[in-house]
């Protein structure tokens, strides 16, 4: 079993990246391929999914992301594509928090996750994620930190909706989202300005 692939990013598409190592290009499906840049050296933590008619590699920037992905695969009704879409939010901590707080409304935002699947995720995983990212679990009940985080997420959500109103496609928005998530405590207007700076380059 290959734990990770370390090499040069050769190609980036909306669904996957190609990372070259030793003259071999590995096609790796990732939650958000646009966080990677062509020619950069990267370490991708991999998960092998084998079916009768396919062999696929799924890759993650951290071991914690990979661990959460494998946990999600244990949930009835969640396959690799569904788990990848959930992690595409770019914030594993928010996913874990939603599970621990039984926040079905958050989980149903993801493609392919209805109320029944959201409930199944909570039933199967609540209380079983401390080994994925322990410090996230420790901080879940810090009320002040949670309020600040929720306010920041609201501002970011409003900014993303504003970009859609301005006519930007989901592909373009997804490309700048990782840069926006690096910022903290910004207002909706500030997030929009940051996004436009990236989009208009």
Swiss-Prot record:
A single GO cellular-component term on record: Holliday junction helicase complex
InterPro entries reported for this sequence: DNA_helicase_Holl-junc_RuvA_I, Hlx-hairpin-Hlx_DNA-bd_motif, NA-bd_OB-fold, RuvA, RuvA_2-like, RuvA_C, RuvA_C_sf
Subcellular location: Cytoplasm
Region Domain III: start-end pairs: 151-201
Stretches the record annotates as Domain II: 62-140
This protein's UniProt keywords: Cytoplasm, DNA damage, DNA recombination, DNA repair, DNA-binding
Gene Ontology BP annotations: DNA recombination; DNA repair
Residue segments, region Domain I: 1-61
Gene3D superfamilies, alphabetized: 5' to 3' exonuclease, C-terminal subdomain (1.10.150.20), DNA helicase RuvA subunit, C-terminal domain (1.10.8.10), Nucleic acid-binding proteins (2.40.50.140)
GO molecular function ontology, one term from the record: four-way junction DNA binding
Assembly and oligomerization: Homotetramer. Forms an RuvA(8)-RuvB(12)-Holliday junction (HJ) complex. HJ DNA is sandwiched between 2 RuvA tetramers; dsDNA enters through RuvA and exits via RuvB. An RuvB hexamer assembles on each DNA strand where it exits the tetramer. Each RuvB hexamer is contacted by two RuvA subunits (via domain III) on 2 adjacent RuvB subunits; this complex drives branch migration. In the full resolvosome a probable DNA-RuvA(4)-RuvB(12)-RuvC(2) complex forms which resolves the HJ.
Homology family: Belongs to the RuvA family.
Domain free text: Has three domains with a flexible linker between the domains II and III and assumes an 'L' shape. Domain III is highly mobile and contacts RuvB.
Function: The RuvA-RuvB-RuvC complex processes Holliday junction (HJ) DNA during genetic recombination and DNA repair, while the RuvA-RuvB complex plays an important role in the rescue of blocked DNA replication forks via replication fork reversal (RFR). RuvA specifically binds to HJ cruciform DNA, conferring on it an open structure. The RuvB hexamer acts as an ATP-dependent pump, pulling dsDNA into and through the RuvAB complex. HJ branch migration allows RuvC to scan DNA until it finds its consensus sequence, where it cleaves and resolves the cruciform DNA.
Protein name according to UniProt: Holliday junction branch migration complex subunit RuvA
Organism: Bacillus velezensis (strain DSM 23117 / BGSC 10A6 / LMG 26770 / FZB42) (Bacillus amyloliquefaciens subsp. plantarum)
């Amino acid at each position: 079993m290959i734990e990770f692939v370390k090499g040069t990013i050769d190609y980036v598409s909306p669904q996957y990246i190609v990372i070259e190592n030793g003259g071999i290009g590995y096609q790796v499906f990732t939650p958000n391929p646009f966080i990677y840049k062509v020619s950069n050296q990267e370490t991708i933590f991999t998960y092998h999914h084998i079916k009768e008619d396919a062999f696929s590699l799924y890759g993650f920037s951290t071991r914690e992301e990979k661990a959460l992905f494998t946990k999600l695969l244990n949930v009835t009704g969640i396959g690799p594509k569904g788990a990848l879409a959930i992690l595409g939010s770019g914030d594993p901590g928010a996913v874990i928090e939603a599970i621990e707080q039984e926040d079905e409304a958050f989980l149903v935002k993801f493609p392919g996750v209805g109320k029944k699947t959201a409930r199944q995720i909570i039933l199967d995983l609540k209380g079983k994620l401390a080994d994925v990212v322990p410090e996230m679990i420790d901080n879940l009940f810090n009320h002040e930190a949670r309020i600040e985080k929720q306010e920041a997420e609201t501002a970011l959500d409003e900014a993303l909706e504003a970009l859609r109103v301005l006519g930007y496609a989901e592909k373009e928005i997804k490309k700048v989202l990782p840069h926006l998530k690096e910022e903290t405590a910004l207002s909706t207007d500030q997030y929009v300005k940051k996004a436009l700076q990236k989009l208009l380059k």
